[in-house]
């Protein structure tokens, strides 16, 4: 299973992103491939929140278009919503305690815990994920 961080979703969609070409190509391959994609709600919510924000984008995506994009991802046969399970709280709190992170990295710890709990790889362009022990993650913009 591959779990995408919100920055992967944004870069795959935003043609003006410096990582768009590489990540969009990778994302299309993943969506059309055999690997299961676990889409967490936090990544979907973040995508819609950010891509529609006029303070971030000069020409923000409309809410309707952002929803259509998210629905198109969820309609793929290899995509499923991934949710916290019974071990999530222990893994999540353990990551916070062992790394000393919180604040802006709290959501990153949540995503790391999801990936660890589900035996998944996390896809992100954010190097902050390197600080979480036992997390398997990669940057699809540089993955060969």
Describe the residue ranges of each PLM region.
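Acidic, PIN/NYN-like endoribonuclease modules and their adjacent C-terminal/linker elements
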Residues: 1, 112-144
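Short, well-structured N-terminal submotif of metal-dependent ribonuclease cores
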Residues: 1-39, 54-68, 144
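Acidic active-site catalytic centers that drive phospho-/nucleotidyl reactions
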Residues: 5, 108, 126
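Active-site phosphate/pyrophosphate-handling residues
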Residues: 7-8, 45, 109-110
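Structured helix-beta-strand junction loops
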Residues: 33-34, 76-77, 118, 132
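Short beta-strand segments at enzyme active-site cores
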Residues: 38-41, 82, 125
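Active-site neighborhoods of divalent-metal-dependent phosphate/nucleic-acid chemistry enzymes
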Residues: 60, 78-123
């Amino acid at each position: 299973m591959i779990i995408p961080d919100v920055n992967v979703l944004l870069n795959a969609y935003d043609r003006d992103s410096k990582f768009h070409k590489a990540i969009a190509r990778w994302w299309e391959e993943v969506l059309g491939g055999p690997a299961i994609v676990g889409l967490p709600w936090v990544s979907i919510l973040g995508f819609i929140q950010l891509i529609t924000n006029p303070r971030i984008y000069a020409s923000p995506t409309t809410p309707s278009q952002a929803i259509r994009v998210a629905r198109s991802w969820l309609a793929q046969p290899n995509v499923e919503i991934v949710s916290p399970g019974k071990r999530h709280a222990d893994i999540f709190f353990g990551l916070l305690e062992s790394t000393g992170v919180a604040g802006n990295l709290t959501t990153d710890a949540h995503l790391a815990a999801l990936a660890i709990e589900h035996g998944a790889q996390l896809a992100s362009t954010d190097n902050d994920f390197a600080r979480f022990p036992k997390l398997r993650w990669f940057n699809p913009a540089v993955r060969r």
